[in-house]
Amino acid sequence: MYVYDEHDRQMAAERVAQFRDQTERALAGELAEDEFLPLRLQNGLYVQRLAPMLRICVPYGMMRSDQLRRLARITRDYDKGYAHFTTRQNVQLNWPALEDVPDILAELAEVEMHANQTSGNCIRNTTTDQFSGVQSDEIADPRPYCEIIRQWSTFHPEFAFLPRKFKVAVNASEQTDRAAIQVHDIGLQMVRNEAGDLGFRVHVGGGLGRTPMVGPVIRDFLPELDLLT
């Protein structure tokens, strides 16, 4: 599990301060709704039927105990005492007050959590098997590769305003697809070639939206070093 360094902590604090200023300007009428919309979406904030909804990032479904306790306290202090775990392994608060969201993000930053790029047309949280790292049938632990994708895609300027949201999943089991990779925009199945080298079988174009589709294989073996290329 990735641990913040000083650069990460500083960037998280600056991001919270920036959004606090944007929220205050929006509440004061200095930012129009169409101006505030892309700013709040980049920080995980939706407004549904006049009620804000905040989606909090849980990278590849992993949380420490202190993070879970902080989430529990936030739901008690700022919401209705409960939260919603999503199919992309994130957490949603459905009743926060708009003016409280910067404070929520500040509290999340204290335990190395955020809501960046959990909403809007960007690369969403990369998901994997909920039992990754402990399954006996894994080819290798998929979580480091999910983290590589997360670091590469977060704040990448080319991925901030995509035509639609984009979803990636990684599966490491040879027997069972526990990450549902064939219904993702990119699905990566970890495999080994005849020489024993680690790589990925690549599925693309899957989805469960308006026109459901099983993603076909476009490459049987992609070397792990070429994952981002």
Regions found by a protein language model. Name each.
Residues 205-211:
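Short connector loops/turns at beta-strand edges and beta->alpha or beta->beta junctions
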